[in-house]
Amino acid sequence: MVQQLQKSMSDGMATTAAAVPMNANGVDTGKVPTAPPDVFFSTENEPEDCTPVKMDPFDRPKSDKDPVEDAIERLLKVMEKIDCPYTPGKEKGVDQDESDDMTESEDHDEMAKDDEGIPANEVRVETRKMDCTTGQLVAPRIYEKVDTLSSTSESSAEEDESMMIIKEGIRVCYGVWKKRQKNSEMALKGLAIVLELCLTQPSARDEIFSVLLETLGFNTVTYWKAVVPQVVDSDLTYATQYREALLFSMCLYDVNHSKNRLRELYAAIPGFRQSMLGIRAKQFTERYRHLQMKIARSRQSSRMSSKYGSEDNIQAMVTLANDVIMDEETAPTQMPLVDMSHDKQRVINVSNAPPVSISRKTSGSWEIKQGSGGLVACVDPVMSADKKNIWLSNLGVNMQEELKEHSTTTNSIGLPLIKQACAGEVFCVLERNEKKELTPKQQAVESDMSLLSVLNTYNKHSYQLNPVVVNQDDYDTYYGGISNGLLWPALHNLPQFISPCYNDPEALREQWCAYVRVNYLFSINAARNSRAQDFIWIHDYHLMLCGQIMRSLEGSLDVSSIEEREGKQKESLQIGFFLHIPFQPPANFMTKYRTVGEPIVRALLRFTKVGFQTSRDRETFVKLVADHIKRTKIDYDSRLDRYTIEHDGFACSLGVFPVSIKIADFVNIAKNPQTVIEAEEIRKQIMGKCADGGQLFFSVERFDYTKGIAEKLRAWQRYFEKYPDRIGKDVLFQVAVTNRRSVESYRQYQDDVMALAELINQKFHSEQYPEWKPVIFETDGLPRSRLIAHYLAMDIGVVTPSKDGMNLVAKEMLVCNPTASLVLSTGAGTEVQLSNAQFYSEQEGKCYHRVEDIANTEAFADNFFAAATESKETRNKHGEKINQFLCVHDIDEWSDQFLDPKWTHEVISECEVKQLGQFYGLMNRTAQVRRQIVECVLKGLPIRPHFKFSLENAKVTRQANDSECTTLTSLETSCPEGTSKLTLEADEESGEEKGFKITYDIHDELSEMEKDLAFLSFIQSDEYENAEEFIKTIGSFYEGGPILFSEEVKQAAEMLQRGIHYNTFFTDRDGTLKSYACSYPTSVQPAYSAVIQAQFARRCATFCAIVTTAPLIHTGILEVATIPEGYYAYGASAGREWYLNPAQQFKDRSFSAVDLTLMNKVFELIEELLEKPEFRTFKWIGSGIQKHCGHITIAKQDVNGTIPARKVTRLHEQLVKIVNDFDPTGTTLTMRESDLDFKIYVKAKLKGRIFNKGHGIRLVKERLKPNMSKGSCLVCGDSESDIPMLEECLKLAGSKVYTIWVTRDQALQEKVSQLCERYSCTNIHYVTCPQVLLGAMAYATAHTLTNEKNRKADSYYDDSDTPMDQEDTPSKQQ
């Protein structure tokens, strides 16, 4: 094969040398060829590096040539051209740095071989094999292990050799390309050829694609930047579908390897995600809808100009996205502080089965009827509550064949094209063709269009039903094959019904690829239809990969994905999954079927919440995760009965949600007089042929091997053998609705069961009652009213599945007929629920007849007898008891609990705060929630309900009592009446400090939570655009009252407005923008404050910086700040260390690297010291432990003097020892002590001066070079430590400085005034508290109509200076 390809390669090179002139895309300038040319090379006489090789777009797939053979031929040409020809049996090429390769983790072991477990020289004969795609039996095949290993067919040998060539080609081309030297462009072409092969057959070439990705390693981003433009060019030029194939290939790789390599593609080509997911189209739609809402509100208040009343001028509206459109006569005096969207949360329901049944009438028109399945009954009430909800499912109308002519489905911004050249995917067609003579194919399209019309009509009167269209072959394999051939029996723990075709690893892999592809199509449809605030609800075992694929595709539909901030808030995308069937896989599921098992279990952990029918199923899943999935953290909250599993940076909540029925619907039908009459007729018709005292046993289910019908009939047969006196009396009415007859295992099972029923009827007769039959067996379904009539007619309901998720039939029976008895097997989820509720216990009584093992025919028969002979009084008592329980726990409770936003790990749950560590952990979680709130508000995204619940639960927590029980109280009520003092235990260790407590004044923490809750209410109201209303909201907490607050705010705002637009803005934090907290770790910036500061920085200033004495990290400003990056620079340690973003950080260079390294080692030892129980208290008091630039601070006492002197003395001794051990001569470190803390300094060569905030301003001026002599400068502070900052700004900006001070200290005010007077600065104002300053900033922001032109006009940098050069970018914080 290789020799033939090399010969054709040489022939191809000779032909190429005489190529005609080409344009930039490699196409003949005179005539467009029918197929694009192959790879083009320069002649041998042409210098190698004089002209770069032109990268052509991907070739159009050739129908007359095998894709693999074609790719290998072209790849061999490339290898020849880069002087690395392929030699069979010998590896040749360039060496490769192993450091560049990204290898797979150790937990992905090689899959077991097909012949594993077969002894040598033995023959395995497969007597029956089912083709899982068609459900048909195929001829038996004989596997001989010796022959298989010793000889290989010619075709498989060629495949192995082809794979070797491709792997070697990838390795060689990558090695040449990554060096960026001679032939690198040609080597890139070789890699592109391999990629093209993978994209032409993504499901079949996943192994090659994996090799390509793993070889590229950390150079993937660079590779995508080079080749994705060719992918796009190919799609646009030749109508290929490579972008879609690339997206699927990446998802398939991520699913199989538990990776997230798709983010590398997004990082390389930011517009790729927006284009493929239609994000720009969604953003346009959301913005337009939001503008319409704003217009409607403005019209209601009679402020809207009629010329904007029409929807025609969309472009004009979009340009006014941030403004309220009003009449010119009533021009706005303010603009919204933020621009929010108030679209309510929708439920995006995703299921394989549709909620409707679609059929075609004889006239050719389509008819849609409401479905009747269990899923529909469960979910339809939730979906019908809002017409904007969306249900995505497959309607059974799929693509029957591969389209020969491709056409693009979206334009460059992701909008669907109005006209589609090929309408095979009928639901992508949005416009009907003009009337003309139609071909048969076009007539089929017209017919499909009529279906689309019916769907549109359906959607007008109900929720939105959107079809997911897939390739029919893929669907058959996914549904009729792996879903029902493997997953269904496996999860029911019925391995005997698993198709033997899955013993072949290659067959399993092929069907697994189809399963992934269909899941991918459902996922991408859900992502394209979802908004940030929606809840996506995935159902059942068909779609278990959707959570992982959606997270790979979208990253997050919430805050972090918009800015591509990887690694933050991964769990913000709300995706729930509910498994309607059991989760009881066989013991070898994770080993024998590892290709399927591990990816499914890992994928389930990517959902936000996963619901199981029973605690038994959840426990099985948790154990499976613990045993087989590495690097997981499993927690259990007994109060909420919730497991939380963390894996790969994601967290998943696992709950038990027993599904139920809509009680009212069944009760109303059961009470209908017509139903009662029909029930009497049924009973008379059946039991009229029996002896007195006979009992009617009734059972109804799908004709499925999981329902235990065969075991039931065997037990029924044994029942009459064991209790012959019941012959002629009792009747079993069995309804088994036939389904899946196309699947061999189902057809065989159904035939065997019907034969058994016939055998029982032939075996047992009653001479006295000759018309009596022991079994009435029907295979047709019953309408609901007639089904309920049978429930009323029965004496005993029989529900005995081998395994079932819940089985709602048992609930339907006793809801409709509470006087009936119930025979229930432990395999039913309903039995687990009733058993957990104590309905089968010695204390509460045994309210039903439990079948422990349906395979135990003797015990099963005894259960029948016990039910038949049970007294009516006992039966009525037990039935009524269960009936009351079921009526309370109905379908509404099930959906409400699953959709409850409070039930998730993302919500701060009500917790017990007893110790210092618990209190600080709680405050840290509020910081995370507040950051999410701020990002949502600043981006105009809806506020999720769980934000409010989290803050409420943080404020209302459980305070432990002295007794064992705990009571639910709030933090403020935990404090003594009239105070905000909170007393907590210092630690839980025994010893001399046992019982030692510490008291905090948490007034600021409580007050800021109250303000944030008020802010959340305001921002979600219709008044959110009114900044003055927001200021009133803050003013309601002001100690002087809202009127005085408003007046003080306006006075401060007037001064701020005089200086707008500020060129520079420097401010202190604690005491200026944030009230002082009980300790620094709890001084979390409130959400409302962060929003005000961010919007002020965005609209009213150019360069903004917060200068603080706190450090950056290690209990520093970055840990308590909630403003997103990019709004403010942070000058920590009085401006000695600066942080703009992760790539821009710098610090004062007064310290040598050796001295700083010494201090870092000292800090690490002190951290270890404070982890010891004896000294742990010092982490939580005051400023805790902080690592500044140049010194370390360790708190030793709180303001109340709570810490015992002996404890402080021991800490001092340990600190002195650590310092002396590292610096025994005292030449580098020095230790100081104040009333509240210890400080360890590095002795710097500063000529005796103390570094202050003025030096920090000077440092940032030197490094970033802002031009402070032009434009206004705003300075805010509250203490003596801020005066050097003001003085430095006055030196640089003089009278253009505007300053606001938060102080009532007359002496401090006098110092500030005198300092400003010295520099002729008269722009001074004093306020009483940080909230007034924040209110003034909000007022000034809303009343200053700035735009981007103002910002561009600012003279931020000196004419001769530029921002920091790339090569001068400071290194990251050490």
Curated annotation (Swiss-Prot):
GO biological process: trehalose biosynthetic process
Superkingdom, taxonomy of origin: Eukaryota
SUPFAM superfamilies xrefs: HAD-like, UDP-Glycosyltransferase/glycogen phosphorylase
PANTHER family: BCDNA.GH08860, TREHALOSE-6-PHOSPHATE SYNTHASE
Record keywords, A-Z: Glycosyltransferase, Transferase
Family (UniProt): In the N-terminal section; belongs to the glycosyltransferase 20 family. In the C-terminal section; belongs to the gob-1 trehalose phosphatase family.
Keyword DNA repair in annotation: no
Segments crossing the lipid bilayer: none
Protein's gene: tps-1
Acidic residues: bias regions: 96-109, 1356-1368
Reactions the enzyme catalyzes: D-glucose 6-phosphate + UDP-alpha-D-glucose = alpha,alpha-trehalose 6-phosphate + UDP + H(+)
Keyword set includes Transferase: yes
Function as written in the Swiss-Prot or TrEMBL entry: Catalyzes the production of trehalose from glucose-6-phosphate and UDP-alpha-D-glucose in a 2 step process.
EC number: 2.4.1.15
Basic and acidic residues: compositionally biased ranges: 56-66, 86-95
Example GO molecular function: alpha,alpha-trehalose-phosphate synthase (UDP-forming) activity
CDD domains, sorted: GT20_TPS
Residue span of region Disordered: 28-66, 86-117, 1352-1374
Disulfide bridges in this chain: none
Full protein name: Alpha,alpha-trehalose-phosphate synthase [UDP-forming] 1
